[in-house]
Amino acid sequence: FSDVNGYKFSQDCITNDLIGKMIIYGKNGSGKTNLSKALCDLKETLTMSNDMKSNHSFISNANSNNEITTFTYTFLFNNKKDKVVYEYQKTDLFNLTNEVLNINGKIIYSYDFNKNRFIEKSEDYFHNSDIFSIYQKNTNPSLPFVRWLVNNGAVEKSSVFNKMYEYAVKITQIFTPTTALIQLSRNELDELDRNVNDLEDFLNYMGIECKLSMEKLPDGSKELYFVFKNRKVAFLENASSGTLSLFNFYIRFLMPHKESSILYFDEFDAFFHFELSEKIIQYIKEKYKDSLVIFTTHNTNLMSNKIMRPDTLFILSTSGKLTPLCKATDRELREGHNLGKLYMNGEFDED
């Protein structure tokens, strides 16, 4: 994310001098979905959210001889004054073996879960010097120290511990949208009622000119309507299939995740025309300016300097190598190049 080139176009893909919006291409089976699980494992570990809902417990590459997998995340907080490196090791989705937190080059703690003891520890950032022994006596065998600190109020709200935890909570994985219409609960209908103007703006942005309203029915339930000059008509019964696909996309993904730190859209445009996919990217770039947003797709029409740039377009090889287009060729890529055409002609190294 820090490997930013000096392109002067599509600056909205860059956030705080980091790549903030990217598209990843790769053959089926290259690992795009697994990449999302690896990147977003921080949320699973710190919040125990089980968002991945995996049906297996292993997390290492199936070809690897290592039983332990290491995850390392680097953050810059407080206007980049504090560099936080958080590292942990796991044998499977649920069991930690080691956890290390480093702030500005100093190890604050290193914990061995197998031995149930701190290998290294520093009292910096903690008001209570007994915090380490309290944790050891009261924790379960695989509860991250960071999570325990935050949930027990052992650190200040403004601390890097809380900031890292809040970042993890807001990580969102979004898998291939479905064309099946979802049934909304009463709470979701209430949420839609509060966001009906935002939904209307979204559809208008996508080129569907309409006015919407939520109406209360005699039985107390709510229903979404198109508003025309002389009457209102039920939205779900009269919207086109394309409009319903966008409605589903908004309801399932955009409405509940307005403040995401990371948004990983896997095969986000599987059911959308490429022009609509382009509009969705533009919309999300505008609405999620401070978020890290990653799209995966097979749509080479989106491989364009019009909406992206060569350092934000990536190829994931079957060997697991992630390479930006600007480093996948010896050619100096310029704004006027047709990147999609170059890709189809075999310009970029995919090994």
Task: Walk through the language-model features, giving the residues of each.
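Pre-Walker A-like glycine/lysine-rich segment at the N-terminus of P-loop NTPase domains
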Residues: F1-D41
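Conserved ABC ATPase signature
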Residues: M22-I24, G220-L254, I262, F268-F272
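Post-Walker A helix-loop "phosphate-sensing" segment adjacent to the P-loop in P-loop NTPases
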Residues: D41-K53, H257-K258, K287-K289
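Flexible phosphate/Mg2+-sensing switch loops adjacent to catalytic phosphate-binding sites
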Residues: T45-N66, K306
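Short, hydrophobic/aromatic-rich segments at coil-to-beta transitions
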Residues: N65-T74, T97
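Electropositive, glycine-dotted interaction segments
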Residues: V85-K211
